[in-house]
Amino acid sequence: MPKKIALVGHCGPDSSFLRIAVSKAERDSVVMMVDDDSDLKRALDDGVDLLLLNRQLDYGFDESEGVELIKKLRQHYPHVKTMLVSNYPDAQAAAVAAGALPGFGKRELGSPRVADAIRDALA
C-alpha cells in the first residue's frame, strides 16, 4: 500500500519541490497538500504516514508555527510521525524536542540526506 505524506502549510513553489523530494525517496507515495486545520484533520483521519510541516504556518491553522502544531499533534496523535522543514537549526532542535523526527531545510531539497530522512521516517 502506498505511503501517505502530507505537506502541511507550504506555499505552492515549496510544495512542488517537496513533492519531487518525496517522490525520489518513496516512488509509490501519495502526497497531499494540507492548507488548514480541516485538511489536517482529514489527513489524520485517513491514516497519513508522515507530516512534513512548514516552520511558519501563515493562515488556516490555529497555530502560527510548525513547532507549536507538532506539540499539539503529539498530545492528540502520539503515533503520527512529523518532521519540520526549516533551514534554522534552532527550529529543528525545538521540533525534535517537541517530538518530531529530525527534519531538513529547504536548501537541502534534492540532496541524498533528505531522501534518506524521508525513507527512514516511512520505514
What are these regions (language model features)?
Residues 2-22, 33, 51:
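Conserved acidic segment of CheY-like receiver
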Residues 52-73:
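Conserved phosphotransfer microenvironments
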Residues 119-123:
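The C-terminal output helix
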